Curated annotation (Swiss-Prot):
Subcellular location: Cytoplasm
Record organism: Acidobacterium capsulatum (strain ATCC 51196 / DSM 11244 / BCRC 80197 / JCM 7670 / NBRC 15755 / NCIMB 13165 / 161)
E.C. number: 2.1.1.199
Gene expressing this chain: rsmH
PANTHER family from the UniProt entry: 12S RRNA N4-METHYLCYTIDINE METHYLTRANSFERASE, S-ADENOSYL-METHYLTRANSFERASE MRAW
UniProt record, GO biological process: rRNA base methylation
The protein's name: Ribosomal RNA small subunit methyltransferase H
Length: 297
């Protein structure tokens, strides 16, 4: 299964820019399936501390199992691990100011979320229109699709999906209601806005992205984390951010640039790092990944 062969995106670059030091304190804001966290833990040693966040209860349980297996493997070399089943925007309340040697945030949706049809993130397999990273909290994508007005839907799809044909898509969704599954929504969107020859993505990709971002308030979460990051890092501490679409990357780019201009950060990546051909062949999801890094002055 995907969860068993999960390989974190840009792993070696992330570890290199984090500059993981034995005995240090590092935070993984997006634990996911613990790929990055496991690599960090291997380098920390018994005097180190790893703090990790994830609001997805299912991912947290799987990550705990992976970290337990790593603890059995490393024995006395395993660092202290502190896990928080909550949104990473709450890091300010859970991490001591100036205590981190490094903070990693990988904003991509995990393979677990994409590959499990019942989570409703993907049109690749039919499932209920849910899309919540924490299935216990907030509106589902189905509620948004079926309850929002046409203009509200169009604006949402345009803003968070950067979809130029948002009005046409919103009109088709309203006419097709009720829309309850991922496959049904994908069919409605594809019929309203067929794929253009110049595009390599599925015609429903941007609409699904927009709904997911809205349902999980993803951009607000990212902004909150990047705003508090300088307070959590000690002098010389590293911030490493991996984004997967232009909206995320724009927020990261602006935060690091502003931090550099204000003398808070030394920006370590003039241009974002991207995955090489070998990695993208192994993991096609890495194609859109961009890594940016900075060091607190």
């Amino acid at each position: 299964m995907e969860r068993e062969r999960h390989v974190p995106v840009l792993l070696q670059d992330a570890i290199r820019y984090l500059n993981v030091r034995r005995g240090g304190t590092y935070a993984d804001a997006t634990l996911g399936l613990a790929g990055h966290s496991s690599a960090i833990a291997r380098l920390l040693g018994p005097g180190g501390t790893l703090i990790a966040f994830d609001r997805d209860p299912e991912a947290m349980e799987l990550a705990k199992s992976r970290l337990d297996a790593l603890r059995a493997e490393l024995g006395s070399e395993m660092p202290k691990v502190i896990l928080h089943s909550t949104e990473f925007s709450e890091a300010e309340d859970l991490i001591e100011p100036g205590s981190l040697d490094g903070l990693l945030a990988d904003f991509g949706v995990s393979s677990l979320q994409f590959d499990e049809a019942h989570r409703g993130f993907s049109f690749q397999a039919d499932g209920p229109l849910d899309m919540r990273m924490n299935p216990r909290v907030g509106l589902t994508a189905a509620q948004v699709v079926n309850q929002f007005g046409e203009k509200e839907l169009a604006d949402l799809i345009y803003e968070f999906g950067e979809e130029r044909r948002s009005r046409r898509i919103a009109r088709a969704i309203v006419r097709a209601r009720p829309v309850s599954t991922t496959a049904q929504l994908a069919r409605v969107v594809s019929a309203a806005a067929p794929a253009m020859k110049s595009e390599r993505i599925h015609p429903a990709t941007r609409t699904f992205q927009a709904l997911r971002i809205y349902v999980n308030q993803e951009l607000g979460q990212i902004e909150a984390l990047l705003k508090v990051a300088p307070k959590l890092l000690r002098k010389g501490g590293r911030l490493v951010v991996i984004s997967f679409h232009s909206l995320e990357d724009r927020i990261a780019k602006d935060a690091l640039r502003e931090g550099g201009q204000q003398g808070i950060y030394e920006v370590l990546t003039r241009k974002p790092l991207t995955a090489g051909e070998e990695e993208t062949d192994r993991n096609p999801r890495a194609r859109s990944a961009k890594l940016r890094a900075a060091e607190k002055k």
